[in-house]
């Protein structure tokens, strides 16, 4: 892996705190002049770290670069897991379909060590937990590769091992999803709603392992 410029890391961390803001608002929050921020953004857009558009957005390249640093920091501070909390909500019915596909099922068995129940438990995160979910967006996780069945191509899925109460499972983060950003999907060898007696609206806390 090539060396990462320390100045670049500082710039990306600063910009991550103002994502979604206009240049004027971001410059004020970062205590920079508009001209200075425009100059920085031009350079980072040229290098592929920042997306084009009126609002400041990091590209996947920018997020991946921050993810490398975040992983090192988590290891340095011996942070092995995070806890997210929220309420159980009904899904769109997609989880049952995707978890029943042989391509995903076999990959999950190989990568995570269990056969997934054909369905997911959906949790709508509390606002503080949504912030911490961004850590997961930046970390590599466990890759469940995409595949094609000859008729359709299915995208890759990022996973993290997790524990809900006493049940070991994982959260899955598909490349393509119709869920809002404050919803996570949990898979396990069992139907979690049934074995844990969960209903819509029930509060839950899930521990997610970062390694």
UniProtKB/Swiss-Prot annotation:
Region ranges (Riboflavin kinase): 82-211
Sequence positions that bind FMN: 177, 185
UniProtKB keywords: Flavoprotein, FMN, Kinase, Magnesium, Metal-binding, Nucleotide-binding, Transferase
Pfam families given in the database record: CTP-dep_RFKase (PF01982)
A GO molecular-function annotation: magnesium ion binding
Biological processes per GO annotation: FMN biosynthetic process; riboflavin biosynthetic process
Residues binding Mg(2+), per UniProt: 120, 122
InterPro entries: RibK_CTP-dep, Riboflavin_kinase_archaeal, Riboflavin_kinase_CTP-dep, Riboflavin_kinase_dom_sf, WH-like_DNA-bd_sf, WH_DNA-bd_sf
Role, per record: Catalyzes the CTP-dependent phosphorylation of riboflavin (vitamin B2) to form flavin mononucleotide (FMN).
Family (UniProt): Belongs to the archaeal riboflavin kinase family.
Descriptive protein name: Riboflavin kinase
Organism: Pyrobaculum islandicum (strain DSM 4184 / JCM 9189 / GEO3)
């Amino acid at each position: 892996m090539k060396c990462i410029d320390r100045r670049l890391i500082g710039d990306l961390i600063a910009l991550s705190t103002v994502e979604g803001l206009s240049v004027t608002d971001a410059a004020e929050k970062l205590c920079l002049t508009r001209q200075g921020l425009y100059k920085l953004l031009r350079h980072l857009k040229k290098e592929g770290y920042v997306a084009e558009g009126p609002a400041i957005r990091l590209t996947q390249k920018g997020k991946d670069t921050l993810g490398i640093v975040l992983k090192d920091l988590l290891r340095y501070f011996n942070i092995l897991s995070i806890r997210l909390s929220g309420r159980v909500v009904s899904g769109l019915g997609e989880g049952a379909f995707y978890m029943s596909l042989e391509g995903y099922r076999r990959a999950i068995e190989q990568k995570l060590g269990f056969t997934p129940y054909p369905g997911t438990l959906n949790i709508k995160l509390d606002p503080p937990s949504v912030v911490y979910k961004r850590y997961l967006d930046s970390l590599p996780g466990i890759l469940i590769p995409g595949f094609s069945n000859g008729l359709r191509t299915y995208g890759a899925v990022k996973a993290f091992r997790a524990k809900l109460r006493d049940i070991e499972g994982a959260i899955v983060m598909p490349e393509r999803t119709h869920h809002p950003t404050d919803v996570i999907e949990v898979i396990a060898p069992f139907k979690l709603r049934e074995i844990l007696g969960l209903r819509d609206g029930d509060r839950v806390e899930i521990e997610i392992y970062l390694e």
